[in-house]
Amino acid sequence: MKKISLYFVLCFWSFGAQAQVENLPFRNADLPLEVRVKDLVARLTLEEKVLLMQHHSPAIPRLGIPAYDWWNEALHGVARTLEEVTVFPQAIGMAATFDTEALQKMGDITSTEGRALFNEDWKAGKTGTRYRGLTYWTPNINIFRDPRWGRGQETYGEDPYLST
């Protein structure tokens, strides 16, 4: 009987704790963003703030914050995935067309596919999966001025008119 009572007490306690997390001001979408951010930052410990600055941020269960992985790339399509996604030419090749409309469409396709992959993981309860976040390190916006630089193909070239 004691075990059953303890089980129910723990269940009710956990539901109450979850309800408290859901009612925190930083989770209230009706509040201004600045208020929500200040509330969240005030609740985070120094250790939690440091952990959130890593590319793989662990979950913070006491605040209901899921794990998140900030590292992903979509230079010419969503990278590092086993799913079938669209792969476009390198940025310098796309830039050579001078077709900014096509570049916009490629960006839209890439972002839609990235969002779909993230949503699949979210529905499956997988948070913090490597290379499956919504943060993409792309494009490389530097002007390619020196051929000795090894990342020139990741840029839109040396033409300032096109690159802006």
Positions of the model-derived regions?
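N-terminal signal peptide c-region/cleavage motif recognized by signal peptidases
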Residues: 14-16
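N-terminal beta-rich core of secreted/periplasmic extracellular enzymes
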Residues: 20-164
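Generic cytosolic/nucleocytoplasmic N-terminal low-complexity/intrinsically disordered segments
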Residues: 1-2, 48
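Detector for intrinsically disordered, low-structure N-terminal pre-sequences
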Residues: 8, 18-20
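Sec-dependent signal peptide recognition
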Residues: 2-8
